[in-house]
């Protein structure tokens, strides 16, 4: 396992240490706050560094075990970064709006995904058999479903882990994940409630630079885990092939008994007759 390295200087440069105004804080975050400056809470980056490494380790384990991660953030600063992260690592994402029951009512969501895929397929056909008005209506329905479900269209079941940026905004996702005992990795700012978060990362959840840094670290972690899986799979295949190599067969040639031809038999009979005639003359 090779986790990406990050330093406190990198965290500082990305503004990870900058929390919210002191009057907006959540008292449950007090253990992660270093102090305040100009009425802004400063996050303890020593703890951030340690907890980031713990979270990355868990993400790596999840991927190596064959798990899938759902990335969730519907705030403007993170929508593009979250979708890019999921696409680059072959995971799933929600970056528009969290639909109630996305995890807890998966059967209904699955039906909506099927509807979305059906609309997409129908609209791709050159001859749909629909009127222009119907096609426009179908297009609007498809676009609406794509915004909400496009990032989970290939998700066959509930994810093995969920990553969240801004726990206040994504409180519904957290409630559903907790109900299903899905491990949660989340960025928790000074106004966040860390309750129920399995692997919290204290940090700024508003600055684009900070969000980009978190996502880049996670991306490198997942790619390394996937590389490990690929290497392990190749080694297993190679080992299996060696075990199944057939042993060299030793050919044993069995000579067939010689069969006398008719000519040979006639010759033998002739010689025998001559011997018999000579014997009778004596």
Model-derived segments and their meaning:
Residues 15, 71, 162, 214:
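Residue-level signature of catalytic and energy-coupling elements of molecular machines
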Residues 101-144, 205-206, 214-229:
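Conserved phosphate-handling catalytic cores of large alpha/beta enzymes
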Residues 128-185, 189:
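Extended, charged alpha-helical interaction scaffolds
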Residues 1-6, 224-282:
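Intrinsically disordered, compositionally biased charged tails
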């Amino acid at each position: 396992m090779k986790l990406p390295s990050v330093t406190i200087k990198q965290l500082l440069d990305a503004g990870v240490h900058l929390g919210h105004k002191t009057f907006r804080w959540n008292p449950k975050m007090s253990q992660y706050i270093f102090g305040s400056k100009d009425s802004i809470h400063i996050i303890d980056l020593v703890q951030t560094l340690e907890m980031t490494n713990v979270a990355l380790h868990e993400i790596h384990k999840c991927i190596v075990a064959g798990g899938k991660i759902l990335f969730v953030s519907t705030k403007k600063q993170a929508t593009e970064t979250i979708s890019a992260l999921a696409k680059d690592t072959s995971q799933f994402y929600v970056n528009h709006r969290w639909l109630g029951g996305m995890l807890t009512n998966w059967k209904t969501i699955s039906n909506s995904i099927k509807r979305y895929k059906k609309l997409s397929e129908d609209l791709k056909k050159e001859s749909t058999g629909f009127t222009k008005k119907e096609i426009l209506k179908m297009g609007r329905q498809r676009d609406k479903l794509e915004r909400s479900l496009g990032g989970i269209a290939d998700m066959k079941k509930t994810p093995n882990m969920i990553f969240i940026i801004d726990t206040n905004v994504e409180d519904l996702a957290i409630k559903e994940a907790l109900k299903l005992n899905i491990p949660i990795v989340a960025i928790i700012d000074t106004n966040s409630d860390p309750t129920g978060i399995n692997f919290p990362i204290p940090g700024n959840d508003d600055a684009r630079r900070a969000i980009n840094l978190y996502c880049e670290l996670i991306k490198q972690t997942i790619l390394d885990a996937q590389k490990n899986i690929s290497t392990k799979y190749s080694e297993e295949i190679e080992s299996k092939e060696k075990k199944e190599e057939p042993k060299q067969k030793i050919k044993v040639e069995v000579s067939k008994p010689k069969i006398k031809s008719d000519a040979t038999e006639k010759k033998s009979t002739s010689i025998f007759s001559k011997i018999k005639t000579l014997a009778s003359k004596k």
